[in-house]
Amino acid sequence: MTHKATEILTGKVMQKSVLITGCSSGIGLESALELKRQGFHVLAGCRKPDDVERMNSMGFTGVLIDLDSPESVDRAADEVIALTDNCLYGIFNNAGFGMYGPLSTISRAQMEQQFSANFFGAHQLTMRLLPAMLPHGEGRIVMTSSVMGLISTPGRGAYAASKYALEAWSDALRMELRHSGIKVSLIEPGPIRTRFTDNVNQTQSDKPVENPGIAARFTLGPEAVVDKVRHAFISEKPKMRYPVTLVTWAVMVLKRLLPGRVMDKILQG
């Protein structure tokens, strides 16, 4: 059985509202289109004003938000609360970027920026919006993690660290909200073709970090994630984790079966 995106209350239809960050393209945009088809009122969070206007023209409610800016997150949260009349059903924390390069080339400021966008911003936004969810006894909080939240590889230590943090945070939040009716899920994509690579910061341009060949062969489009996102939002029993792509499944199995040194050799290439 699934939840419907609308409820009948006192003779009126109330549309359930969800906020999606990182909505300008890729996983965020595809998920927004699908949840809109499912009947949700989608608040589409974007970092650039032009993208906010584009979301409005597509039938969404555009919200300007930069997760790297605490002030922007606060303003966006206030706007979402006002737009939903303090009644929000779901949050899809999807925005983020990758800081790639050997750890020896990454400064403290760069590491802080990686965590600010991928982790601290999602924490701040979720905590600001929880009061608009808790009184209603139901809801969904969905996080875009990554296969890099399960493993780390050379050149991706900063990005993986931010996703490891997101995994631990989501596990704790899920247990803390266990009696609230709000369910917490993690989406764990492997290699996905999106504009994410446009937002990758390379710390050594002469030695760029590239997708290994085996990952490139199993890269899927963002639509591969959409079914998982839909299930997380409308199923009465959403999963705690949704692995996406063969690469993620393989990593989960190999981590359980192989000694750490063997995994290191595989991941080092």
Curated annotation (Swiss-Prot):
Binding residues annotated for NADP(+), in chain numbering: 15-41
The set of disulfide-linked cysteines is none
Q: What species is this protein from?
A: Escherichia coli (strain K12)
* CDD domains according to UniProt: 17beta-HSD-like_SDR_c (cd05374)
Segments spanning the bilayer are none
Protein name per its UniProtKB record: Uncharacterized oxidoreductase YbbO
**Which Pfam families does this chain map to?**
adh_short (PF00106)
Keyword Cytoplasm tagged:
no
Where substrate is bound, by residue? 146
The protein's matches in InterPro entries, at most eight in alphabetical order, are given as: NAD(P)-bd_dom_sf, Sc_DH/Rdtase_CS, SDR_fam
- What EC number(s) does the entry state? 1.-.-.-
Q: Which SMART domains match?
A: PKS_KR
Family indicated by similarity: Belongs to the short-chain dehydrogenases/reductases (SDR) family.
MF terms from GO for this chain are:
alcohol dehydrogenase (NADP+) activity; oxidoreductase activity
**Catalytic residues, chain numbering:** 159 (proton acceptor)
Check the record and name the Gene3D superfamilies matching this protein: NAD(P)-binding Rossmann-like Domain
Q: What class of enzyme is it?
A: oxidoreductase
